[in-house]
Amino acid sequence: MTPDPTQLSTDACTLPDGRTLSYASGGDPDGVPVVVHHGTPGSRLFGALLSGPAAETGVRLLVPDRPGYGRSSPPAAEWSWEDWPADLGGLLDAESVERAGVLGFSGGGPFALAAASDDRVARVGLVSSVVPPAENTLATLASVPFALRAMFRISDAVASISGPSAVVSQYTDRSVSDPVAEAVAADFHEALDRGARAVERENRAFASASLDADSVGVPVRAWHGTTDENTPLSPVRSLIDELDGTFETVEADHLGTLLDRRAAALEWVARKE
C-alpha cells in the first residue's frame, strides 16, 4: 500500500478555550470514523501511512495534530493524555461524529486509551504502544528538558540533510519503499516544525505518570512486535491483561508492526458491535 499525502486534506477546529486543533481527513468519507493518534513526535501527516488502507476498509480517517505539534496550538499550561478527551470531544463535535473508534501508535497509545472516557468512543486499538511509566532513554532525558529538546532539534536537522532514511532508521531495521520513507520523514519534520516542546512534554508525562485502566470500559486490542526495540512488549501485555483485552504479537519491529497490521487494526477498530 503506497502512502499518498494527496489523499489527505487538512482542516481545523477551534476548541472552547480558543486553541486551534488541526487535523487531517482521509480514507472513505462515508466510512466509519476512526481517530488516529500519531506517535511522539508525530503529526497529522502520519495519516499518509493509513489513508490507503482506510479507503479499502471503509474507514473515515481523522488524524489530529496533538497540542503543540504541526498546526495545532500549544496548550496554555501543563497538559497530558488526561486532558486529551476534552480536545477530542471538540474534534468529534466539529466533524459531527456520534460514534468513533480510536487507534494509537507508539506515543499515541496513552492518548487513545484516555479517549475511551468519551462515551462516543466505541473501541481502542494500540499499535507498538508506549505504556507509562516508561523506562527508556527518552523518558530519562525528559528529566533534563533542554537535553531532550536539543536531541530532537539535532535529529531533525541531520535528517533534513541526510534524507528520509535517517528518520526511518529510528523506527525500523527493514527496507521500506521510498513513499513510505518519505511519509515517515514528513511526519517527523512536521512534528518538530515549531520546536520540540511538545515531544519533551509528552515524554516527561510518559516517565512520571501511570495509565488509569479503570477509565477504559470499551474493547481494547493491541498489536506489538516481538523485536520492537523502541517500546517494550511486556508492559503492553500486562496492560492488556488488566484491561481484559486482546493481544497479538507480530514478528516485526516498531514501525514494521504498523506497516504489517495497519489494515487489520483499522478494520478491527471500525468494527461495529
Where are these regions (language model features)?
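Catalytic histidine-centered segment of alpha/beta-hydrolase-like enzymes
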Residues: 230, 250-266
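Conserved alpha/beta-hydrolase "acid-adjacent" motif
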Residues: 229-235
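The serine-hydrolase catalytic nucleophile loop
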Residues: 39-52
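Alpha/beta-hydrolase
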Residues: 149-212
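Flexible "cap/lid" loop of the alpha/beta hydrolase fold
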Residues: 123-154
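Short beta-strand/loop motif that positions the catalytic acidic residue
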Residues: 216, 222-224, 228
